[in-house]
Each structure stands twice: as structure tokens, then as C-alpha cells.
Amino acid sequence: AICSLVLYLLALMLMEKLSSNTVDAQEVELIWTILPAIVLILLALPSLQILYMMDEIDEPDLTLKAIGHQWYWSYEYTDFKDLSFDSYMIPTTELPSGHFRLLEVDHRVVVPTESPIRVIVTAGDVLHSWAVPTLGVKTDAIPGRLNQTSFITTRPGIFYGQCSEICGANHSYMPIVVESTPLPYFESWSTLLSTSSL
């Protein structure tokens, strides 16, 4: 339908005796150049503002800092004093029966269920990516830059992820395990972890 209309208007313009006025009309060209530019600017400005507002996380219950290294993750619970640990993959030779190969870690990230969690992600050496697909989270870890993301777990459980950026020879040995627990269990875990040394 659109092609037919364009062909009809083109034929009308070519057969008309006054076509020279339409073909050389600089005013028309100026209007159909400036008007779409103004419309695009009017669409872009609010869209950029909304894009930045979507990235803001209002009052999370917990802030977690994930730092990517070759080839493990370090975690800091910034709302707690001295609550940080390194998380390494458990080698296949030491893996308990029934656990997932290449996905289990020695220290899991524990978060409270039904609480907004902010994750600040960075790297200490090369590019990494903190990704837990079942939580809908993937954030690039870039040295010297802090990226943030957020998630809420709606049920208790264990969620598996991995580094999603090729970061070297042992890239596939950087699993991420997030354990979501009810708030009382999280509080007892954080108390126990902060009093003991890893």
C-alpha cells in the first residue's frame, strides 16, 4: 500500500507541468530535514533520562561488592564490618557426591530472600562478567570501574552462575553460587561468618 502511494505520487509529480517547482524546492527539503531531527531530539531526551533512572537502585536492603580475579571471586558485604571472603571453585577431586561439577564453590554468596540486593561489580586484573542467569543478572566487571546491578530473590534456593567474559586460560573455573535464605538464617550466617575467620 505504501509503495503504491509513493509510485502514484512520483508519477503525478513527473507528469505535472509544474514539476520543476517541486523538484527544486529547497524550503521543502529544509523542512523534511529539520522536522525529523527535532522529533528525534524530543524523543531522545526523555528516553535518556528514563534509561539512567532505571539503573538507579533505591534503598537496597543489602549491598554486595563482587570483585573478579583470575580465576576466583572476592565478595565484600559493605553493610557489615569485616564481612568479606574469597570464593574459589571446588576441584572435581574434592567435590562431594551429588554436587555440580565446575559449579560448586567453597564459599557461597548468601543473601536474604525477598530483599532488594545491590551488587557492585568490578575487577582486579582483566575483564570479567558476574552472571547468574536464573536471577536475570549479568554485569561486566571492568578494572578501575564500578558497575552496579540489582536483584530480588522471591524464594529460598541456590542459584548458579559463571563468569561470562573470556578472561584467560581458567575462565571456565570461575563459578558463582548465590544462596537465598530467609532473613533469620541470613542474620545468623552473617554473625557466624564475621566472628570466624575464613
UniProtKB/Swiss-Prot annotation:
One of its GO terms (biological process) is ATP synthesis coupled electron transport. Binds a dinuclear copper A center per subunit. Its main location: mitochondrion. Residues 14-26 are mitochondrial matrix. Its EC number is 7.1.1.9. SUPFAM superfamilies: Cupredoxins (SSF49503), Cytochrome c oxidase subunit II-like, transmembrane region (SSF81464). It catalyses: 4 Fe(II)-[cytochrome c] + O2 + 8 H(+)(in) = 4 Fe(III)-[cytochrome c] + 2 H2O + 4 H(+)(out). Residues 55-198 are mitochondrial intermembrane. Component of the cytochrome c oxidase, the last enzyme in the mitochondrial electron transport chain which drives oxidative phosphorylation. The respiratory chain contains 3 multisubunit complexes succinate dehydrogenase (complex II, CII), ubiquinol-cytochrome c oxidoreductase (cytochrome b-c1 complex, complex III, CIII) and cytochrome c oxidase (complex IV, CIV), that cooperate to transfer electrons derived from NADH and succinate to molecular oxygen, creating an electrochemical gradient over the inner membrane that drives transmembrane transport and the ATP synthase. Component of the cytochrome c oxidase (complex IV, CIV), a multisubunit enzyme composed of 14 subunits. The complex is composed of a catalytic core of 3 subunits MT-CO1, MT-CO2 and MT-CO3, encoded in the mitochondrial DNA, and 11 supernumerary subunits COX4I, COX5A, COX5B, COX6A, COX6B, COX6C, COX7A, COX7B, COX7C, COX8 and NDUFA4, which are encoded in the nuclear genome. Belongs to the cytochrome c oxidase subunit 2 family. This is Cytochrome c oxidase subunit 2. The lineage of its organism: Eukaryota, Metazoa, Chordata, Craniata, Vertebrata.
